[in-house]
Regions:
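A short, acidic, amphipathic alpha-helical segment used as a generic capping/interface helix at domain edges
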Residues: 314-329, 333
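Hydrophobic core register within WD40 beta-propeller blades
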Residues: 96, 142-144, 256, 328
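Beta-rich carbohydrate-recognition and catalytic domains
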Residues: 29, 40-89, 93, 97-137, ...
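Extended ligand-binding clefts on enzyme/binding-domain cores
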Residues: 252
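Membrane-proximal basic amphipathic "stem/tether" segments
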Residues: 1-63
């Protein structure tokens, strides 16, 4: 029975990670006559005459282990950190947006498949009776922002029938009328064009000229516009030289926010393999407030490194060391970022804007 449960669990992990399973390969791993290939759900493989322990099913199993950089790069900016304990153990990766002077709206992941919305007070306490479970499923990483009609739009990545190779960006209205503030379920609409190749994840929304725009890629900086009919069109693509020390793809994190000077603050993360786990490190950047939205500044050190994750894993203990920012609010000199710590707990941190800017250098 235990062996069958392990097999089912491994199949589920493989489906979620790669969208398909090599049954023969899986059988070779779980074959009782090949116990040496299975030890605490890991496998050993040789790379340049070195043995590297990998998690079963992870795409990083074919990649070399990369050493972590020096402490001058892995910096943690001082901030006020808050843990948000939701009713569902293991809740993580929340998006946030300001509702009014007294309240914020938070949408988080109670598990790996669903979203729940709630209200927070200014001390980040959940307001009693405000929880609402949305009917959306097979969804990840909620980012929220108000549109010009005072509707709250939820933007997220979605998969159909666990086909992760076809992951795409969707949106839906979750509050029809800001004055009422009532959560609703409305039909979802596809945002990322169907003709785009590869998985589409972590598109970062922002508002420009009362229209929702989205950053599909950080470098090159690729910008789409979502029109009133929910049709998404690519507008701009600009290349720039990144000062970020980790030479991996810069991936989107939080929504972008317009600053007082008219430019936008945004964030990104990179993922690197280290000792069989994926380490997620976070940086920020500033881009122009005018088309084509050129990148003006970018971090050359982290504001929230992977090692700052401190929660005991509820899931993925053998897979990740991760702080994953999703939501951002900027109020005067205060930057409020919501994130998931090790895919285990919702957290919110307050930074001084000037401290984040100090992590960046000019882009020419």
């Amino acid at each position: 029975m235990e062996n069958k449960e392990n097999i089912a669990r491994l199949i589920d992990v493989a489906k979620r990670r790669i969208g398909s399973i090599d049954i023969n390969g899986l059988n070779s791993i779980i074959d009782p006559n090949k116990d040496n290939m299975l030890k605490k759900n890991t496998r050993e493989l040789s790379y340049k005459k070195e043995k590297i322990v990998r998690s079963i099913g992870a795409s990083r199993s074919t990649l070399p282990d990369k050493g972590r950089l020096n402490e001058k790069f892995f910096t943690k900016v001082n901030g006020n950190f808050h843990s948000i304990y939701m009713p569902e153990e293991g809740s993580f990766n929340a998006g946030i947006v300001r509702y009014n002077k007294e309240k914020l709206i938070c949408v988080y992941r109670p598990d790996e498949y669903n979203f729940i919305g709630c209200y927070l007070d200014n001390n980040y306490n959940v307001i009693k009776g405000s929880y609402y479970k949305f009917k959306i499923n097979n969804c990840a990483d909620p980012r929220v922002l108000w549109n010009s009609k005072n509707q709250l739009i939820l933007i997220y990545s979605s998969v159909d029938k666990s086909e992760f190779s076809k992951e795409h960006i969707c949106g839906t209205v979750i509050i029809e009328d800001k004055e009422s503030g009532v959560f609703v379920d409305r039909p979802a609409f596809r945002i990322s064009p169907i003709n785009l190749e590869g998985r589409q994840k972590n598109w970062m929304p922002f508002t420009y000229n009362n229209k929702i725009h989205l950053i599909a890629h950080v470098n090159p900086h690729v910008i789409y516009e979502l029109n009133d009919n929910n049709v998404c069109k690519k507008l701009y693509e600009t290349k720039w030289k990144s000062p970020w020390m980790i030479k991996e793809s810069l991936r989107g994190s939080t929504n972008a926010i317009r600053l007082d000077d008219g430019n936008y603050l945004s964030t990104f993360h990179t993922s690197m393999n280290h000792r069989g786990k994926l380490y997620y490190d976070n940086g920020c950047y500033i881009f122009s407030g005018k088309p084509p939205f050129n990148v003006l500044k970018c971090a050359n050190r982290t504001y929230l490194p992977a090692e700052a994750a401190c929660e005991k894993h509820f899931r993925k203990a053998n897979d990740i060391v991760c702080n994953f920012p999703v939501g951002m609010i900027v109020e005067d000199n205060k930057v409020i970022i919501s994130y998931g710590d090790n895919d285990t707990l919702v957290k919110i941190v307050e930074y001084k804007l000037e401290d984040l800017i100090k992590t960046m250098v000019d882009i020419y």
